[in-house]
A protein has these predicted regions:
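Phosphate- and divalent-cation-binding pockets in alpha/beta enzyme and binding domains
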Residues: 7, 69-71, 149-150
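C-terminal accessory regions
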Residues: 103-154
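Conserved coupling/interface region of RecA-like P-loop/ASCE motor cores
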Residues: 1-37
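Conserved beta-strand termini and adjacent loop/short-helix elements that scaffold enzyme active sites
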Residues: 36, 84-86, 142-144
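Hydrophobic, well-ordered secondary-structure elements that form the walls
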Residues: 8, 91, 131
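Short glycine-/polar-rich loops that comprise or flank the Walker A/P-loop
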Residues: 28-31, 79, 93-96, 135-138
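Conserved helicase/translocase motor-coupling segment
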Residues: 40-114, 118, 127
Length: 154
């Protein structure tokens, strides 16, 4: 957890994760959370972020492979921009992370066996935590609703 700035850890705690925040952490920028209406808004946000970042390695993380492929097909390829699923990002760290594809439809399972639903919710909550902790300096969270609302449903 020490890779993250104080602001990133405070954000993770504020959206509903029970983590302890140590002393003497690096100070950084506030987490950027953007509520978007559709894929076009998401693409605009990501294009602006990509244009601003020339030096830092940026990880754009999705839950599904389909969305990862979609973003790869729509966004300019730059050496420092990595688009991948959260699963693919496990064990990797980035200067900047942008977590995308945040919606209840994607992360909160329904219409399934109750035990399976509980297990999927736990796994998805863990996945979101993994995504959030990949960021060393800057974190962007982009979705159709706030991350807190999604985590509270898991």
């Amino acid at each position: 957890v020490y890779r993250n700035t104080k602001q990133i850890l405070e954000y993770i705690q504020s959206v509903g994760y029970n983590i302890s925040i140590g002393e003497n952490l690096r100070d950084g920028v506030e987490v950027h959370e953007a509520i978007i209406a559709n894929e076009e808004d998401e693409l605009q946000y990501l294009k602006k972020l990509i244009d601003e970042k020339d030096e830092e390695v940026v990880g754009i993380l999705t839950k599904t492979k389909e969305h990862s492929h979609f973003l790869n097909s729509k966004l300019t390829a730059k050496e420092n921009i990595k688009i991948m699923t959260i699963n693919e990002a496990q064990g990797v760290e980035f200067d900047v992370v942008c977590l995308t594809e945040l919606s209840r439809e994607v992360f909160v399972p329904s219409h399934e066996d109750e035990q399976l639903q509980l297990e999927k919710r736990r796994v998805n909550k863990d996945l979101i935590y993994v995504a959030l902790t990949r960021a060393m300096s800057e974190l962007h969270v982009v979705g159709r609703e706030s991350l807190r609302e999604i985590v509270n449903k898991l």
